[in-house]
Amino acid sequence: MQTLPKERRY
């Protein structure tokens, strides 16, 4: 399963 770069919210 490919891990997609998730949007980091600060």
From Swiss-Prot:
Q: What broad class describes the main subcellular location of this protein?
A: other
Residues annotated as signal peptide: none
Q: Which gene encodes it?
A: cbbS
| Other noteworthy facts | The basic functional RuBisCO is composed of a large chain homodimer in a 'head-to-tail' conformation. In form I RuBisCO this homodimer is arranged in a barrel-like tetramer with the small subunits forming a tetrameric 'cap' on each end of the 'barrel'.
Q: Which UniProt keywords apply?
A: Bacterial microcompartment, Calvin cycle, Carbon dioxide fixation, Carboxysome, Photorespiration, Photosynthesis
Family as reported in the entry's similarity comment: Belongs to the RuBisCO small chain family.
Could you confirm whether the keyword Cell inner membrane appears in this record?
A: no
- What is the protein's quaternary organization? Heterohexadecamer of 8 large and 8 small subunits.
Taxonomic superkingdom = Bacteria
From which source organism is this entry?
Anabaena sp. (strain L31)
Protein localization:
Carboxysome
Would you kindly state one Gene Ontology biological process term found in this protein's UniProt entry? reductive pentose-phosphate cycle
The entry's cellular-component GO terms read: carboxysome
What protein am I looking at?
Ribulose bisphosphate carboxylase small subunit
What does the UniProt record say this protein does? Answer: RuBisCO catalyzes two reactions: the carboxylation of D-ribulose 1,5-bisphosphate, the primary event in carbon dioxide fixation, as well as the oxidative fragmentation of the pentose substrate in the photorespiration process. Both reactions occur simultaneously and in competition at the same active site. Although the small subunit is not catalytic it is essential for maximal activity.
